[in-house]
Amino acid sequence: LVSDHMVLQRHKPNVLKGSGVPGRSVLLEFAGKEYRTVVNQGGHWRIDTEPLSPGEPRQIVAISGEDTLQVNDVRIGDVWICSGQSNMEFSVGSFLWAKEEQKKAVEGDSWYYTLPNNLDLIPSDELPASQWKAASGNDLLQLSATAYFFAKHVQPEIGVPIGLIVSAWSGTAIE
């Protein structure tokens, strides 16, 4: 779930993971701090960050050998899981008044990550490619309407960025 525009949970340690060459060191720069670890024999690394408070957008830089990964516009706020069937999958763009709602959406308050529907019987640590998007502009139309209206109601009350992780698939069992 790591991409530009992602939202991380405030006031809690956050886990950042990656993969690389076994035995190679990893330097992670985030929120004015440096974290170091080593890629394990399975080719994976993990860093637990310190808890952070909301503030200006941040950047994450991970460096391992000649490889550098940069993640921009990282927000610290509240992250919510939005899971369900057709009622959660129904998008803002499906409403008759979608264009009016699109004009009212406040840019910079909420972002979302929609997990692609993927049926696989073999467990995997990797997710199909997706990215965090703003809950405004043209991207708003693809967002779950239930998730959007929840964020629209909650964000002004708590006053921090909202991250919505949407996992919705019509006609499937919730478990």
Language-model regions: role of each:
Residues 1-175:
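Cell-envelope and extracellular/periplasmic
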